[in-house]
């Protein structure tokens, strides 16, 4: 039986009022003290990734971390940031308990704050 679950994300830039285009995201699987990079992607013009971050046989229960490269994104958008930036990286650690479910992790992002939730 094939798994139907998948992981997606969507990043909105709340400071500039638009999707976060070109934002680098790293996806890790956490196992004990080990952190394994699964893939690195960049958001498209809609602030989404072209296709799921994980799906099918590669989508498994466990603990994961998405790392959003906020500082690089805002600098490339022309936003003047302090040195060091308040939010250089935004790590979101979450669990996947059901390999047959859709896990959507939206991020609302500004240079000084962020919000996330399990979306649909």
Swiss-Prot record:
Stated role: Catalyzes the hydrolysis of 5-hydroxyisourate (HIU) to 2-oxo-4-hydroxy-4-carboxy-5-ureidoimidazoline (OHCU).
GO biological process terms on file: purine nucleobase metabolic process
Gene3D superfamilies assigned to the protein according to its UniProt record, in alphabetical order: Transthyretin/hydroxyisourate hydrolase domain
Quaternary organization: Homotetramer.
Lineage start: Bacteria, Pseudomonadati, Pseudomonadota, Alphaproteobacteria, Hyphomicrobiales
EC number(s) per entry: 3.5.2.17
Further comment: HIU hydrolysis also occurs spontaneously, but more slowly.
Catalytic reactions of this protein: 5-hydroxyisourate + H2O = 5-hydroxy-2-oxo-4-ureido-2,5-dihydro-1H-imidazole-5-carboxylate + H(+)
Protein name: 5-hydroxyisourate hydrolase 2
Any GO molecular function: hydroxyisourate hydrolase activity
Residues where substrate binds: 10, 48, 117
Key words, A-Z: Hydrolase, Plasmid, Purine metabolism
Listed Pfam families: Transthyretin (PF00576)
SUPFAM superfamilies listed in its UniProt record: Transthyretin (synonym: prealbumin)
Species of origin: Rhizobium meliloti (strain 1021)
NCBIfam families: hdxy_isourate (TIGR02962)
Family in the record: Belongs to the transthyretin family. 5-hydroxyisourate hydrolase subfamily.
